[in-house]
Amino acid sequence: GPRLADAACIATMDRQHVPQAVPALEKGYDLLLEKPVSPSLEECARLARTARRTGRRVVVCHVLRYTPFYRKVKELLEAGAAGTVMTIQAIENVGYWHQAHSFVRGNWRDDRTSSPMLLQKCCHDLDLYLWLAGKSAARVSSFGANSFFNAAHAPAGAADRCLSGCAAKENCPFDAEKIYLTNAATGIDAGNDGWPCEVLAAHPTHDSVREAIRTGPYGRCVFACDNNVVDHQVVNVEMSDGSTLGFTMTGFTQHNTRFAKFMGTAGELTADLLAGEITLRQFGQPEQVFSVDAAEGHSGGDAGLVRAFVELMLGGEPGSGLTSLDVSLESHSIALAAERSRLAGGAAVEIAPLL
């Protein structure tokens, strides 16, 4: 049929992106594409070639670039506030219940049907820190495993499902009733009818969510699921200029948030997303604190991304944050190289140019 619009948004599961994006480009659509592009480097390259041949634009949803918080970090680092950045230390605190929801019980638990967790969860972060520091990656090494969410760690008396008479339920923080019904931050009984409850039921109520826990995948014991992705991973990146990034992704945290420290030749800058605070300590000077309120939806990044995409479609210039396919693929190359390193016992892997 005829083309129906100027642009299309592709937000399906990871392995469906490229098979849907290629025909859309051939049809003449510009694309707003959910990350990750694909767990296959060959597919990523195929999409990039198609975009070039058709002259269409593909913008990848690296939403963190569009947050007021990280835009302020970028402004300070670009102005040389910390000098030349030599060391970056960063952590993705996934959050204990988010790990259980998305990567143990949920859609991204199995890398054979989705993608490695580092690519799914942290191509965001890898893209972000390279952009903030103005760096490109040369080599990577990585360690990590699914060390806890497996049958060996099931407590005594655990059942296969949380509502099937589990004797360990009372003291289990991963209990589905706690996460989806009673938890003040996530439970439907506390009025949380958005994510994650909306994943269990289209119109979340106490009854619809409880029924989903009783019968669906989100009511399974976290120690009795078919998950194979990691629950913690560390990544070391050597940049092309010799500077380094040490990155940790872990599900064993109270909050799901990001924290980073940029250490440079003139000072250090810490970025605490949860507190909404950026602290600059220039050597020998009093510290400066910048407060940036975090908005809803990836700290305001979701709305900022869509705004930037619409402006691009209306003929505006692509802003510095707008992540083109070519730029996005660097973070995919790093994440997939890190996964190769992890599977090879931590051996260093060179980051080859993808295109």
Residue ranges and their predicted role:
Residues V22, A48, K74, L126-L130, ...:
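Non-transmembrane alpha-helical segments in soluble domains
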Residues L33-E34, V60, Q89, A271:
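Hydrophobic residues in well-ordered beta-strands that form the structural core
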Residues R46-V63, G83-A90:
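Rossmann-fold dehydrogenase core element
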Residues N228-L355:
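C-terminal helical cap and adjacent loop that interface with cofactors, partners, or active-site loops
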